[in-house]
Amino acid sequence: MELKVLNTGGSETGEVVTLNDAVFSAEVSEHAMYLDVKSIMANRRQGTHKAKNRSEVRGGGRKPYRQKGTGHARQGSTRSPLMTGGGTIFGPEPRDYGLKVNKKVKKLARRSALTNKANEGGIVVVEDFVFDQIKTRQMAEVLKNLGLDSRKTLMLMPEHNDIIVRSGRNIPKLQVVVADNASTYDILDSQTVLVQKTALKKIEETLG
């Protein structure tokens, strides 16, 4: 598959890049994408939920009423789960929700996601660019020139550039990441993947 390289003004540079078939025309594995996205979402969970059981609730040393003669069932503590203010039976406990996915499956998932995006025509290649200073307006103008201002866009850089990242931070539908760090979830969650030309080579080296 060949794509024309655009400049930040939205015009063609006259250059054409050929996408690596091993990455952008791979066999799509829905199951690999499912496993990877599931692990990403699971690993985001804090798992800090907790309810106190009868041994952890404050108080409860006193017997609520005498053993016999009240007509009620016998009770030994005011913090029994049967009483108001008592502990919780089988309540939530802190746990780790993390899921492990093999590196090969993660790579397959990312290749599948990029292939899906390429088949949809959702990959745009732009020449490398940097800004002199942090300017959200400048980044918004680039997206408008490329016709991506109304689309949820994942922009891939060859390496971290703080000015570019911070220029795009306040644009609601834009996410800027280093090409190596783009996850399967990031790719699938976007409508368009905007790739800087040098970043394209890094992706192909990593996943090819």
Curated annotation (Swiss-Prot):
Residues 44-89 are annotated as: Disordered. SUPFAM superfamilies: Ribosomal protein L4. It comes from the Bacteria. Gene3D superfamilies: 3.40.1370.10. Residues 60-71 have a biased composition (Basic residues). It holds the Pfam family Ribosomal_L4. InterPro entries: Ribosomal_uL4 (IPR002136), Ribosomal_uL4-like (IPR013005), Ribosomal_uL4_dom_sf (IPR023574). NCBIfam families: rplD_bact. Belongs to the universal ribosomal protein uL4 family. One of the primary rRNA binding proteins, this protein initially binds near the 5'-end of the 23S rRNA. It is important during the early stages of 50S assembly. It makes multiple contacts with different domains of the 23S rRNA in the assembled 50S subunit and ribosome. Part of the 50S ribosomal subunit. This is Large ribosomal subunit protein uL4.
